[in-house]
């Protein structure tokens, strides 16, 4: 018996192939496999179980703002490295790498848009940029958001998804809590409405400052909302926390948020609130 002279072509076993990468997505809630384009059409909400995956800033713009258009404010502001912080990689290099990848310039975008035909001052955290952490630039942009909204007599809609204060800026990041809340208090004296939208996750210094100070605090389903994470709390107090602790539903039951609104209903819900809260007022141009 002789071996055949022709052999089949071989492949390098070290080459890893990803079938359907970027084409199919598995739901984190029910493990159903989705066409990625289908999830994009539903703004990252699973059609089988209703699980809400993270939606980026561009997706939120398209979902909430008329025609998805935002006249951005203060885009020139970018983070500095005042402490020359390094944890194996310098803070400056981390920011530069994110900019090189085409990510946002910072962990928040602000500007003027229209929601349901009504002018609003709009802000949305960018979780993909260092976990939506709040440093000096984020605090400054939130402050400017409220200050400009006060001058132009605009309602503020602010979407929050953040891990808290940015450790690379130390005490400078913590000072943004007081600074932003001071601007918010001046805004409130003008008797203008602030709608706070709490996304997954909203934690740390953001949760401890302006996140719960809205005239209406609206949360997405099953969002993690709180100061420290559940594991940190359990390790500190050495007790087991109640089921669902720090989730939207738990907070609603205990009066910490005013409503839980599924993502597909968010624009209509906010539009109705604005209609009631801004009746008889017109924004300045």
Curated annotation (Swiss-Prot):
Belongs to the AccD/PCCB family. Its main location: cytoplasm. This is Acetyl-coenzyme A carboxylase carboxyl transferase subunit beta. Acetyl-CoA carboxylase is a heterohexamer composed of biotin carboxyl carrier protein (AccB), biotin carboxylase (AccC) and two subunits each of ACCase subunit alpha (AccA) and ACCase subunit beta (AccD). A zinc finger (C4-type) spans 27-49. Zn(2+) binds at residues 27, 30, 46, 49. Residues 23-285 form the CoA carboxyltransferase N-terminal domain. GO terms for biological process: fatty acid biosynthetic process; malonyl-CoA biosynthetic process. The keyword GTP-binding does not apply. Keywords: ATP-binding, Cytoplasm, Fatty acid biosynthesis, Fatty acid metabolism, Lipid biosynthesis, Lipid metabolism, Metal-binding, Nucleotide-binding, Transferase, Zinc, Zinc-finger. Disulfide bonds: none annotated. Its EC number is 2.1.3.15. The gene is accD. Pathway: Lipid metabolism; malonyl-CoA biosynthesis; malonyl-CoA from acetyl-CoA: step 1/1.
